[in-house]
Curated annotation (Swiss-Prot):
Region called 6 X 11 AA approximate repeats, residue ranges: 32-115
Designated name of the protein: Late embryogenesis abundant protein Dc3
Sequence repeat segments: 32-42, 43-53, 65-75, 76-86, 87-97, 103-115
A single cellular component GO annotation: nucleus
UniProt feature, compositional bias: Low complexity: 152-163
Membrane-spanning ranges: none
Basic and acidic residues bias (residue ranges): 28-56, 67-84, 91-113
Entry similarity comment: Belongs to the LEA type 4 family.
The entry's keywords: Repeat
UniProt-annotated stretches for the region Disordered: 1-117, 139-163
Amino acid sequence: MASHQDQSYKAGEPKGHAQEKTGQMADTMKDKAQAAKDKASEMAGSARDRTVESKDQTGSYVSDKAGAVKDKTCETAQAAKEKTGGAMQATKEKASEMGESAKETAVAGKEKTGGLMSSAAEQVKGMAQGATEAVKNTFGMAGADEEEKTTTTRVTRSSARTE
């Protein structure tokens, strides 16, 4: 029986070696799988960290650019407001100057017209008196004193203009 046990022992020996070898290979595979898992996890964490950092940088960049755009817009709006205010002031001043000029022109026109009207009134008055005297003389209604005083006065336009 000893030989049967030897045979059985010898038959079990390769089986044990195979099991041991399989166990070692399984352990090696487990170790490699765990190492690959750890490395993948580490890479994923690193990628996540880089993504978060990139997002923060991008957010900061976008925020900075948005702030710059906002500042530029405010500056442009302020400049437009100031320019409009200046244009309005210039328009007010020009309108005031034009109003003053129109007033001066109206006063000068009134004075000139008043002078012409006064001159024309004097001419009409003189002609009316001359016509009255002529009619009186024609009908013999003028007295002796009036006939001597009456002289025909002729007023011409050129003399009226020079007055």
